[in-house]
C-alpha cells in the first residue's frame, strides 16, 4: 500500500487552491508561495496563509498596489 504524500508544513493543498476564490469579488486567486499569501488582483488584496490554512477574511487581508 502506498503512503500518502507528505506536503511541507507551510504548503497549501493544491486541490484547495483550485476551488478558492476571492470572497469580495469571487474572482481567481494567485498563490504566492514565497510570501505565503493568496493574491486577488481584482480586489487588490493579499490573503495570508497561516500554518497551511488560507485566512479568507477581508479584514485580515493586506492591501496591495
Swiss-Prot record:
GO cellular component terms, A-Z: cytosol
InterPro entries per record: Trm112-like (IPR005651)
Any single Pfam family the record assigns to this protein: Trm112p
HAMAP family hit by this protein: UPF0434
Assigned protein family: Belongs to the UPF0434 family.
Protein name listed in UniProt: UPF0434 protein BRADO0313
Organism from which the protein derives: Bradyrhizobium sp. (strain ORS 278)
Lineage: Bacteria, Pseudomonadati, Pseudomonadota, Alphaproteobacteria, Hyphomicrobiales
Amino acid at each position: 500500500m502506498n503512503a500518502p504524500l507528505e506536503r511541507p508544513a507551510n504548503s497549501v493543498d493544491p486541490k484547495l487552491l483550485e476551488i478558492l476564490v476571492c470572497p469580495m469579488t469571487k474572482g481567481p486567486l494567485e498563490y504566492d508561495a514565497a510570501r505565503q499569501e493568496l493574491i486577488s488582483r481584482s480586489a487588490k488584496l493579499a490573503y495570508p496563509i497561516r500554518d497551511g490554512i488560507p485566512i479568507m477574511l477581508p479584514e485580515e487581508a493586506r492591501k496591495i498596489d
